[in-house]
From Swiss-Prot:
Biased composition (Basic residues): 38-50
Name of this chain's protein: Uncharacterized protein YIL161W
One Gene Ontology term from the biological process aspect of the record: nonfunctional rRNA decay
Composition-biased stretches (Basic and acidic residues): 51-60
Remarks, miscellaneous: Present with 1230 molecules/cell in log phase SD medium.
Keywords: Isopeptide bond, Ubl conjugation
Entry keyword Ubl conjugation: yes
Organism: Saccharomyces cerevisiae (strain ATCC 204508 / S288c) (Baker's yeast)
Cellular component GO terms, alphabetical: cytoplasm
Cross-link (Glycyl lysine isopeptide (Lys-Gly) (interchain with G-Cter in ubiquitin)): K16, K35
Amino acid sequence: MDTKLSVTGAKKSQGKASGLGNEGTPIGNEESTNKAKNGNKKRNKNRNRNKKTETKEQNEPKPVTGGEEVRVEKSQAKNRRRKNNNGANKKNTLHYSKEINVEERKQIAKRQEEIEQCIHTLSDFKLFKKGKHVTSYGYRISPMTDSGKISLKILFNIPLDYPKAPIKLTMKSNEEVSSYMDTVIANFNWKARQLVKEDWRILSQINYLVSELEILKMENYKQIDKLRNSFYKTI
């Protein structure tokens, strides 16, 4: 009997022990789970802390050494000079273009006004041809020759940039040109360069041609004109 009781008691004690072991297993799992969660939290905190540190380092300017500081200052100064030069050039270009436009308008107005004066005053002064760079007006003169007075149709070519460029005298293509008219044309065109610089109007230049025609026929006209100008300066 005693032997059976001891065996039975041993079995019961083993059953209790095994029961206690089974009851302790969930507690152990819960503790390990909590440890894992805490470990993850710590790792996440460390990651966030590292990210903040990296971001801060990126945002904060790096210390500049002496050589780098000089290079940065030179680059900034160069950029400022380039910006100032571009601004100044732009202003100068705009100012210059405005001046050109104003000067061109004055030039065109002066040219047109002088042409209209010739048309109004001279009945034979008529438009002959409009070109890309010059406008030609026909005019008839009556020079005296050895065989008497003749009528010739001449052309005054007025450039579009007159009075910057002088007018130019030519003969109409179907007109018979004598040698003395070649001399007249060459001498007048030489004189016209001087007259436009002295601000002679187109009408006054035409009057000069008509009134000085006999002198313009001379081969030594340039010498005569220079002597005449020297004489007038002494008066």
